[in-house]
Curated annotation (Swiss-Prot):
Chain's gene name: Atp2b4
Region Calmodulin-binding subdomain A, annotated ranges: 1086-1103
Protein name per UniProt: Plasma membrane calcium-transporting ATPase 4
Regulation of its function: Activated by calcium/calmodulin.
Tissue: Ubiquitously expressed. Not detected in liver. The highest levels are found in uterus and stomach. Isoform XA is found in uterus, brain, stomach, small intestine, colon and pancreas. Isoform XB is found in uterus, skeletal muscle, lung, kidney, spleen, stomach, small intestine and pancreas. Isoform ZA is found in testis and isoform ZB is found in testis and heart.
GO cellular component, one term: glutamatergic synapse
Domain of life: Eukaryota
Classification via PANTHER family: CATION TRANSPORTING ATPASE, PLASMA MEMBRANE CALCIUM-TRANSPORTING ATPASE 4
Residues that bind Mg(2+): 785, 789
Basic and acidic residues: bias regions: 334-349
Disordered: annotated segments: 294-319, 330-349
Subunit structure: Interacts with PDZD11. Interacts with SLC35G1 and STIM1. Interacts with calmodulin.
InterPro entries for the chain: ATP_Ca_trans_C, ATPase_P-typ_cation-transptr_C, ATPase_P-typ_cation-transptr_N, ATPase_P-typ_cyto_dom_N, ATPase_P-typ_P_site, ATPase_P-typ_TM_dom_sf, ATPase_P-typ_transduc_dom_A_sf, HAD-like_sf
């Protein structure tokens, strides 16, 4: 077998010399990992003997792991490679410059500027101006006339500056997004055993020979072989396309592959392949090679099928066969289909993007119409004036001069469009989001999808988990019911009969994940550290409080000796472990929710430690007198029980039979204190108009008590607290289908959903989002930590995954990761989201004022004076101010607490409120009045020569310089006004906290002074006197005074004002719209979202361009995810075989018949899961039962959530 790309294998002599020290080579391990199931078992047995022998050859211990010696680790990296997939090579700066030059508007400006430049050197024969009319400068100004080329050159220079600024911006943005991705990579760690210690190691540092601890919810970071496992089931659909979960056992299928998800159980594996040598890495390498070949073919203009490349890959080595499920179709047709499929089904845009798209299209249309009218009127004016009124003949020698005039008109028209179209919007969005994302990291929010940031600003509802989010996730047993006695404090060991104490200790120590541990405190006098499942840590702490050593018990009964483990899942809602008794027979330890466990018990231990009957009446009394009082104090109640099998070995698949007739040992009450900062955070949410709902698996009384402590419920409230069963009864019809009408009667009053499953959470979230009751449709945020929370996290407008307690599966489904698992971080995300929304609105208010004034001035000037008072280069400068600098200044305003004192904007509230419209029109009136006054009377007011109707190549005039200077200074001071959009009087509030804003305003003012005083002919400016400067400055400051006048006018009194920028319920872009350009969509995403701001949109195809900008920006961060480590590689949608299916399932509503079938499948799945084979991999073999399972991404699919 050959390596698909030569650089993949360490080929240097050092690596080769080290390779001999290990009992197997890199190629041996790669060949082994290509095998599956029985083939793999046979190969291991024939060539290595056993998995333990492989560990011996790799010089690692199955129990202790590697020693962690740096020299040994480096040797392994040399021989077997690093656990890293090389990122795609970034584009060079010159490539980015070339990309920026492709913009249609810039090309038009370049061509027009070049024509203007060439024609400016032409003079009509005879040297008399009258030949072609009064279109060139007077004879005495011939020297000045010789410099007519400067305007064309200045436009070219402006284009070059724009191109370089664009390229630099693109480069810096890509660098920033790569930095964000590397931060996400660093956050990804995996449990590795080194030197006998379980440590969390960054994924990139894993080497071949490491012993990895695998648990449910993990995304496997490398290939490996199972050493020991408990009920381990893997979702391999990302590699094989198989939706059914694969059970992994030592004797049937021990091969674990990178990029696959652990859906159930736990175990240990020895790492055998990492990085580009793992199965995922090999696929990545092959696909990358094909992409390069395709790119080369495109460059050469060849039109050959990609199937040829794939066939070559298959003949190169057998590894290519592993990726067949990813490419089931062949030939040209399949490639076309795959390209379309990779774009996925209709993508729903975020609320802000939808509103911006509609607004930008409207503005773009208006700008296009105005620019066309401007050019037509200028041409008509010129033609009528010269050839009709003055009756001149069109002379051949004057044609270049006329063309030069037409080019000038055309340039004016293009510059009107440059100013009119809001190409600064993408930059404002990008800067605001990038700034917010960077700052949100400090507030413990790791944003994975940029648009989730602004969506949080619209959130109207938050469905939060309880454990770890609202509470501290530090479990402590504070009460217990043992042997008929309710202990309000932890009992002393002497108070308990010896046999009862032994049963409590053994049941807790053995029947819990061996990864759950209590470690010494990091600081002297601190609390012991809890590692692993926090509920189990609380129980182990109870054992420690009873003065017992749980490690000693586990040493006597190591994990390898456990006969069988029934891991926790949402169907069982309990965990059980089977062990062999020394005297023969079996003992089953079981723990779970107290009500569920008590129903399975028919006997109980008494005070003396004897076993007595436990009748229904006794159970009811226990619930009433023990469990409910514990729950009302906010304690989680866990039941512990056991059962002995002394006779014939039972059928371990029949769980219903095994888990009946249990003996109740104890019921414990576990306290998980509410985080001290949570009540205040929930009060902030209430004040901000956000409803907080708690969704938990706990007892309804426990949930109600915690909700009251948090402030979700207050005494006297008329709100609902429901259990999952009651919730489903209320919302489903006789057929078991969810009815939206019924759900709409429940969710507005629902505040607590207890004893809920992940399916219930998904149903609730979907129901709230799909509901149409009320003025505004709901925007829902959801928190989740379990594998099963994936569907709800995907369905929610914003999904929050827990960074500490969350599984990899939950994190991959989320939009934002809470690095501290704290609810207050969600409130901070709301604040940042609203700040993004306000930043965009501030920028819009500013930009639309400039748009309205500049377009009307250019249009009116063209119609009346046959010239625009603002020249092309000046317009480009104004555009640079209002686009680049203004977006930088207004999009980086820090958030304030005042953002949380108003209600959410909602989905349908317009971007431009009536107050903003008042501000826009009010300031436009002031600016237009001043500009027109200066244009038509400025020469008299300042006693200077008029600049109106100047000849074609005349020198700059003081008159029009004052117009330009005043116009820019008015925009500068209006930028300060634009800091407030809700009618606030003090526009300077907090301005000194925003250093960027102050720097931009002062920097722009300084540049304006240089342009006027030094810019000269290229900027059509001439020097101004100090008095003229003072007047310009005074008029500019007048903007601030005028702003106070506008804010004093009540908005309600202006009935004629309309709102703008409304959002529809669901903004969608169809596949047809996506396919308008044949350029690779993934390549366009980063380019469009980041480049369009400076170089301008395509003014000819404004509508299409603007729609595509905001659509592609939704996924801009995905382009930046150059896979640094293998851990995140398989999360990329283009490599997920079932992506389209899963997305369509989540995004489209089910038809009643489909929903019914899904539920039938779910019931079958649940029923058969209970009876399936759960034998521990180290125990006796049993018959395997086929499971009828729904799709892994289905909302109805049930996986596990911790107790």
């Amino acid at each position: 077998m050959t390596n698909p790309s030569g650089h993949n294998l360490p080929a240097n002599s050092v690596a080769e010399s080290y390779e001999g020290e290990f009992g197997c080579t890199l190629m041996d391990l790669r060949k082994l990992m290509e095998l599956r199931a029985a083939d793999a078992v046979t190969q291991i047995s024939a060539h290595y003997g056993s998995v333990q022998e492989i560990c011996a050859r790799l010089k690692t211990s199955p129990v202790e792991g590697l020693s962690g010696n740096p020299a040994d680790l480096e040797k392994r990296r040399l021989v077997f490679g690093k656990n890293m997939i090389p990122p795609k090579k970034p584009k060079t700066f010159l490539e980015l410059v070339w990309e920026a030059l492709q913009d249609v508007t810039l090309i038009i400006l370049e061509i027009a500027a070049i024509i203007s430049l060439v024609l400016s050197f032409y003079r009509p024969p005879g040297g008399e101006n009258e030949i072609c009319g009064h279109i060139v400068s007077n004879p005495e100004e011939d020297e000045e006339g010789e410099t007519g080329w400067i305007e064309g050159a200045a436009i070219l220079a402006s284009v070059i500056i724009v191109v370089f600024v664009t390229a630099f911006n693109d480069w810096s943005k890509e660098k920033q997004f790569r930095g964000l991705q590397s931060r996400i990579e660093l956050e990804q760690k995996f449990s590795i055993i080194r030197n006998g210690q379980l440590i969390q190691l960054p994924v990139a540092e894993i080497v071949v020979g490491d012993i990895a601890q695998v648990k449910y919810g993990d995304l496997l970071p490398a290939d490996g072989i199972l050493i020991q496992g408990n009920d381990l089931k893997i979702d391999e659909s990302s590699l094989t396309g198989e939706s059914d979960h694969v059970k992994k056992t030592l004797d049937k299928d021990p091969m674990l592959l990178s990029g696959t998800h652990v859906m159930e159980g736990s175990g240990r594996m020895v790492v055998t392949a990492v990085g580009i040598n793992s199965q995922t890495g090999i696929i990545f390498t092959l696909l990358g090679a094909n992409e390069e070949e395709d790119d080369e073919k495109k460059k050469k203009g060849k039109k050959q099928g990609v199937s040829e490349n794939r066939n070559k890959a298959k003949t190169q080595d057998g590894v290519a066969l592993e990726i067949q499920p990813l490419n089931s179709q062949e030939g040209l047709d399949s490639e076309e289909k795959e390209k379309k499929a990779s774009k996925g089904p209709k993508k729903e845009k975020s609320v802000l993007q939808g509103k911006l798209t509609r607004l930008a299209v409207q503005i773009g249309k208006a700008g296009l119409i105005m620019s066309i009218l401007t050019v037509l009127i200028l041409i008509l004016y010129f033609v009528v004036d010269n050839f009709v009124i003055q009756r001149r003949a069109w002379l051949p020698e004057c044609t270049p001069v006329y063309i030069q005039y037409f080019v000038k008109f055309f340039i004016i028209g293009v510059t009107v469009l440059v100013v009119a179209v809001p190409e600064g919007l993408p930059l404002a969005v990008t800067i605001s989001l990038a700034y917010s994302v960077k700052k949100m990291m400090k507030d413990n929010n790791l944003v994975r999808h940029l648009d989730a940031c602004e969506t949080m600003g619209n959130a109207t509802a938050i469905c939060s988990d309880k454990t770890g989010t609202l509470t501290m996730n530090r479990m402590t047993v504070v009460q217990a019911y043992i042997g008929g006695t309710h202990y309000r404090q932890i009992p002393k060991p002497d108070d308990l009969p010896p046999n009862v104490l032994d049963l409590i200790v053994n049941s807790i120590c053995i029947n819990s994940a061996y990864t759950s541990k209590i470690l010494p405190p990091e600081k002297e006098g601190g609390l012991p550290r809890q590692v692993g499942n926090k509920t189990e840590c609380g129980l182990l702490g109870f054992v420690t409080d009873l003065k017992q050593d749980y490690q000693a018990v586990r040493s006597e009964m190591p994990e390898e000796k456990l006969f069988k483990v029934y891991t926790f899942n949402s169907v069982r809602k309990s965990m059980s472990t089977v062990i062999r008794k020394p005297e023969g027979g079996f003992r089953v330890f079981s723990k779970g929710a107290s009500e569920i466990m008590l129903r399975k018990c028919d006997r109980i231990l008494n005070k003396e430690g004897g076993i007595v009957p436990f009748k229904t009446k006794d159970r009811d009394n226990m619930v009433r007198n023990v469990i409910e009082p514990m729950a009302s104090e906010g304690l989680r109640t866990i039941g512990i029980a056991y059962r002995d099998f002394d006779g014939e070995e039972p059928s371990w698949e029949n769980e219903n039979e095994i888990f009946t007739g249990l003996v109740c040992i104890a019921v414990v009450g576990i306290e998980d204190p509410v985080r001290p900062e949570v009540p205040d955070a929930i009060n902030k949410c209430k004040r901000a108009g956000i409803t907080v709902r708690m969704v938990t698996g706990d007892n309804v009384n426990t949930a109600r008590a915690i909700a009251t402590k948090c402030g979700i419920l207050t005494p006297g409230d008329d709100f609902l607290c429901l259990e999952g069963k009651e919730f489903n009864r209320l919302i489903r019809n006789e057929k078991g289908e969810v009815e939206q009408e019924k759900l709409d009667k429940v969710w507005p009053r629902l505040r607590v959903l207890a004893r809920s499953s992940p399916t219930d959470k998904h149903t609730l979230v979907k129901g709230i989002i799909d509901s149409n009751i009320g003025e505004q449709r709901q925007v829902v945020a959801v928190t989740g930590d379990g594998t099963n929370d994936g569907p709800a996290l995907k369905k929610a407008d914003v999904g929050f995954a827990m960074g500490i307690a969350g599984t990899d599966v939950a994190k991959e489904a989320s939009d934002i990761i809470l690095t501290d698992d704290n609810f207050t971080s969600i409130v901070k995300a709301v604040m940042w989201g609203r700040n993004v929304y306000d930043s965009i609105s501030k920028f819009l208010q500013f930009q639309l004022t400039v748009n309205v004034v500049a377009v009307i001035v250019a249009f009116s000037g063209a119609c009346i004076t046959q010239d625009s008072p603002l020249k092309a280069v000046q317009m480009l400068w104004v555009n640079l101010i209002m686009d680049t600098f203004a977006s930088l200044a207004l999009a980086t305003e820090p958030p304030t607490d005042s953002l949380l004192r108003r209600r959410p904007y909602g989905r349908n509230k317009p971007l431009i409120s009536r107050t903003m419209m008042k501000n826009i029109l009010g300031h436009a009136v002031y600016q237009l009045g001043i500009v027109f006054l200066l244009v038509f009377a400025g020469d008299k007011l300042f006693d200077i020569d008029s600049g109106r109707k100047a000849p074609l190549n005349s020198p700059p005039s003081q008159h029009y310089t004052i117009v330009f200077n005043t116009f820019v200074l008015m925009q500068l001071f209006n930028e300060i006004n634009s800091r407030k959009i809700h009618g606030e009087k003090n526009v300077f509030a907090g301005v000194y906290r925003n250093i960027i804003f102050c720097s931009v305003v002062l920097g722009t003012f300084f540049c304006q002074i240089l342009i006027v005083e030094v810019g000269g002919k290229p900027f059509s400016c001439t020097n101004l006197t100090m008095e003229q400067w003072m007047w310009c400055l005074f008029i500019g400051i007048g903007e601030l005074l005028w702003g106070q006048v506008i804010s004093a006018i009540p908005t309600k009194s202006l009935k004629f004002l309309k709102e703008a920028g409304h959002g529809s319920d669901k903004e969608e872009i169809s596949k047809d719209a996506e396919g308008l350009e044949e350029i690779d969509h993934a390549e366009m995403e980063l380019r469009r979202g980041q480049i369009l701001w400076v170089r301008g949109l395509n003014r000819i195809q404004t509508q299409i361009r603007v729609v595509k900008v905001f659509h592609s920006f939704r996924d801009v961060i995905h382009k930046s995810k150059n896979q640094v480590s293998i851990h995140s590689f398989m999360t990329q949608p283009e490599y997920a075989a079932d992506d389209e299916m899963s997305q369509s399932f989540l995004n489209q509503e089910e038809s009643p018949s489909l929903a019914s079938k899904s539920r039938i499948t779910k019931r079958l799945s649940d029923a058969e899961t209970v009876s399936q084979n759960n034998t521990n991999n180290n125990a006796v073999d049993c018959h395997q039962v086929q499971i009828v399972a729904s799709h892994p991404n289905s909302p109805l699919q049930s996986q596990e959530t911790p107790v």
